[in-house]
């Protein structure tokens, strides 16, 4: 009798789980929760020569957590004449074991005067937008220091 009840319980549990899978239900904990990763003591940094700039390079777009829509990224507040073509991290890019992904955001840095420029890397899923600072160092010798 106990084994019949146990079998009936298992069958009803399997039927309920199958029904939820068929209607596409996801647990509340699977809601999109992502973070644009920031390391304040070690911001992303690139160095360029003032006369050459860097016509095509990338900043990392480090996303941690879970997302179910595309997260777009771009860099703003760049030195004059510079631009960003942006980048994206798609839901399928997500590493389920690590719950993170590092995408790439394109930038082209124009020749610009020597100095240190603080730009802003932003990421958005269309609802939430997050930002972190990135540093562009412009100097004659990027290998010195």
Report the location of each language-model feature.
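Long beta-sheet-rich domains in secretory-pathway and surface-associated proteins
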Residues: 2-7, 14, 18-145
């Amino acid at each position: 009798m106990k084994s019949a009840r146990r079998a009936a319980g298992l069958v009803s549990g399997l039927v309920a789980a199958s029904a939820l899978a068929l209607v596409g239900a996801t647990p509340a904990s699977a809601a999109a929760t992502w973070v644009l990763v920031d390391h304040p003591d070690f911001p992303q940094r690139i160095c360029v020569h003032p006369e050459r700039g860097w016509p095509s390079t990338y900043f990392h777009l480090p996303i941690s957590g879970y997302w179910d829509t595309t997260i777009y990224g771009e860099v703003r507040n760049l030195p004059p004449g510079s631009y960003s073509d942006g980048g994206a991290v798609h839901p399928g890019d997500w590493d389920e074991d690590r719950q993170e992904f590092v995408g790439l955001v394109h930038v082209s840095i124009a020749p610009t005067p020597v100095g240190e420029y603080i730009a802003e890397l932003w990421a958005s899923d269309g609802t939430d937008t997050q930002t972190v600072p990135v540093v562009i160092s412009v100097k004659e010798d990027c290998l010195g220091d």
